[in-house]
């Protein structure tokens, strides 16, 4: 009997299959022995994403969700399991993420997130650095339901979610003091050719910051022929050996 919990990974995407393919590959490389699934929720109507794999469900919506917070809630509702991992479509997760997180996850607490991550900017690795890094977290459906999910917001939806957790379940959202050699999350900034919702402004209650700007960014690139349209068979792969990149950086820091 498998004693390891089944996990669902939530991956939202909008108009950037080239980075999504790397995120899916990150999932496929996971060394976790328990059952797992990746839910890819796409609401860019110009693309129908196609990928056939028993552990990956790609869901294409013909209409865009009003906010990314509501999109997250829908993805969680579609998840088969009750331990949920946020899986950003433009970042990298090393193969030990699921295993390491489950090993350090306390079901009574219901939340796990490391305090630090690597930063990859224009191909150069930096860090470790601390930030919110909600997309490196996992949590139980019990906690999610306890705060009624994510707020109907754009930029800042993740911050508000964790603030609600901290208020409703004191101590739950405290991050884990991870060692450099244990870090599994690589936050990518410049160099992907894509957008960051956070670059369009800070959280303002009720303003859905970043929503329209992301849509405009994608529309403009599509008009220039820089974003593929129609049916897109996904071909997951990494553009760089990120395991080796981190290993080399750690060796340099140790010296």
Per-region residue spans from a language model:
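Short beta-strand-to-loop element that shapes/binds the nucleotide-sugar donor at the catalytic cleft/hinge
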Residues: 112-126
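Short aromatic/hydrophobic "clamp" motif used to bind/position activated sugar donors
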Residues: 84
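A conserved acidic beta->alpha catalytic loop
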Residues: 40-50, 88, 92
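Cell-envelope/extracellular polymer assembly enzymes that use nucleotide-activated donors
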Residues: 5-8, 37, 160
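Short, acidic, metal-binding catalytic loop of nucleotide-sugar glycosyltransferases
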Residues: 22-35
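Acidic donor-binding/catalytic loop of UDP-sugar-dependent glycosyltransferases
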Residues: 91-104
């Amino acid at each position: 009997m498998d004693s390891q919990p089944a996990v669902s990974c939530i991956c939202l995407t909008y108009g950037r299959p080239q980075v999504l393919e790397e995120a899916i590959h990150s999932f496929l490389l996971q060394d976790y022995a328990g059952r797992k699934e990746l839910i890819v929720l796409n609401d860019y109507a110009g693309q129908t994403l196609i990928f056939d794999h028993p552990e990956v469900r790609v869901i294409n919506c013909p209409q865009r969700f009003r906010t990314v917070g509501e999109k997250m809630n829908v993805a969680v509702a579609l998840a088969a399991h009750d331990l949920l991992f946020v899986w950003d479509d433009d970042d990298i997760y090393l193969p030990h993420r699921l295993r390491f997180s489950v090993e350090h996850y306390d079901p009574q607490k219901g939340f796990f997130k490391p305090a630090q991550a690597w930063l990859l900017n224009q191909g150069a690795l930096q860090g470790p650095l601390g930030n919110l890094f909600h997309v490196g977290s996992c949590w139980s459906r019990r906690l999610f339901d306890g705060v009624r999910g994510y707020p109907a917001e754009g930029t800042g939806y993740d911050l508000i979610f964790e603030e609600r957790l901290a208020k409703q379940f004191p101590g739950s959202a405290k991050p884990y003091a991870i060692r450099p050699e244990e870090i599994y999350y690589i936050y990518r900034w410049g160099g992907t050719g894509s957008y960051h919702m956070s670059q369009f402004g800070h959280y303002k209650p009720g303003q859905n910051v970043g929503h329209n700007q992301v849509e405009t960014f994608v529309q403009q690139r599509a008009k220039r022929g820089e974003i593929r349209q129609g049916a897109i068979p996904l071909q997951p792969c990494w553009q760089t050996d990120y395991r080796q990149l981190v290993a080399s950086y750690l060796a340099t820091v140790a010296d």
